[in-house]
Amino acid sequence: VQASSGMADLMRRATDKPTYAPTILADKLCALTIVYSVLAAVVHQRTTSRGQRVEVPMADTMLAFNLVEHLAGHTFEPAIGPMGFNRSMTEGHQAVRTADGWACVLPYTEKNIADFFRAAGREDLATDPRFGDPASRAKHYGELYDEIGKLSVEKTTVQWQKICAELSIPFAPVLELEDAETDPYHTGSGLVSLAEHPTEGTYRQVGPPMILSDTPPSVRRHTPARGEHTSELLAELGYAGEEIANLVSPVSA
């Protein structure tokens, strides 16, 4: 799906190699699309008393996801430029090294950019016309990110975090997965918690990330063993006890 939707090609444009996203991106994205598609059909059914067939093709879903910004110059007919969102495809559009680690720093507005360069002691870059307006920046993203990368190594991650917070510049230290899980922000929300499985013992579970004021979500069931819900699902579909027993019992040779 990543290959047929252009995702692997986007990775090639960014890394020179058509690699896969390091997560089960298509599965997760299509699952979310299925959820809101089914909910839309439920709303329609409750309004009109009519059901309908819901299809969510994985390749189409991924392609639509990619083309939102990467249609780019092919948005118009005839095309006025290449496909691919220029800023995302620019070399250097990535985390930068600090004096003691890595961080993501993204001065976005003219003020952000000028403030960042002034904080780094580079008044010349703060007033550089290449970065002074959106049209000029679009032609010089590579140089902008290159200059940020050169300056970021002059201070520690904590120093940059403090500076960027004071100047309202988007910034975040790069956390390893292990550190992200135990970061105070995430532990405070209770996103990852310990639970007891009836057969497998203690395990970590990832809870719902959303917050609902009146109906807060929670994890109500443990991670199922293979086939654990088969009988329950068949019963919901209208199968009787004996039919279920025949369906779930091993087939004899």
Language model region names:
Residues 1-103, 107-108:
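Active-site-adjacent "lid/gating" segments in soluble enzymes
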Residues 2, 29-33, 107-111, 143, ...:
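Conserved active-site and cofactor/substrate-binding residues in soluble primary-metabolism enzymes
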Residues 38, 49, 116, 164, ...:
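Residue-level signal for nonpolar/aromatic packing positions in well-ordered secondary structure
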Residues 72-82, 183-197:
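Short, surface-exposed loop/helix-turn segments at secondary-structure junctions
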Residues 86, 91-167, 171:
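Aromatic-enriched alpha-helical interface/lid elements that frame and gate functional surfaces
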Residues 165-186:
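Conserved PLP cofactor-binding pocket of PLP-dependent enzymes
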Residues 182, 242-253:
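Amphipathic terminal alpha-helices
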Residues 196-246:
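Flexible, small-/acidic-enriched active-site or ligand-binding loops
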